Amino acid sequence: MALQQIVEQTVAGLGYDLVEIERSAGGLLRITIDLPWQPPVEGAASDAAAPAGPEAFVTVEDCEKVTRQLQFALEVDGVDYKRLEVSSPGIDRPLRHEQDFQRFAGEVIDITLKAPIGDAAAGQVNANRKKFRGTLERAETGGWQIVWSDEPPPKPGQKVSKKRVPAPLQALGFTLDELRDARLAPIVDFKGRGPKGGPAPD
């Protein structure tokens, strides 16, 4: 059985989602897991009076449980590795599936296209550009887009004039097939993640 299939079946069987599999030099096999997420049901009545519960995260106990089961499964199938590491996603969590984009809509993400933007740039950005950072949104066409402003964020303590005209927002639509890589932007915010724009990297 292929490694991907072994890991997916084992992780899913324990009630977790497989985020990423990495094989590093020296025989390290790194597995990233997350708690399952269910999209909200459209049209379902919501209880406005009920407070939202705290967001759940993968714990050390979760990783230990998956590690034990994976060690057994990998040994049975004779998978060659030196060390197994199971962890939760970091602040730069990869986005690979449609459900990942649904889950993190409104967050700031970094994307890398497989090919330069080319003629679609329409003179607004460098036609050879592949990397973008912006807020993930659902496009009117039903696909996905990121929205950003090239205006640099104010420095700490800097006063921003109320008369200052903000830079226009730009949007880039894309399909998952056009992406080489997509991840949550590694933004450290002690108030918690929230939908907010960010400058696009060069």
From Swiss-Prot:
Annotated signal sequence range: none
Entry keywords, A to Z: Cytoplasm, Ribosome biogenesis
Keyword Cytoplasm recorded: yes
Pfam families linked to this entry: RimP_N
Alphabetical list of SUPFAM superfamilies matching this protein: YhbC-like, C-terminal domain (SSF74942), YhbC-like, N-terminal domain (SSF75420)
Protein localization: Cytoplasm
InterPro entries: Ribosome_maturation_RimP, RimP_C, RimP_C_sf, RimP_N, RimP_N_sf
GO terms for cellular component: cytosol
One record GO biological process: translation
Disulfide bonds: none
Function: Required for maturation of 30S ribosomal subunits.
Protein family: Belongs to the RimP family.
Protein name in the entry: Ribosome maturation factor RimP
Organism: Paracidovorax citrulli (strain AAC00-1)
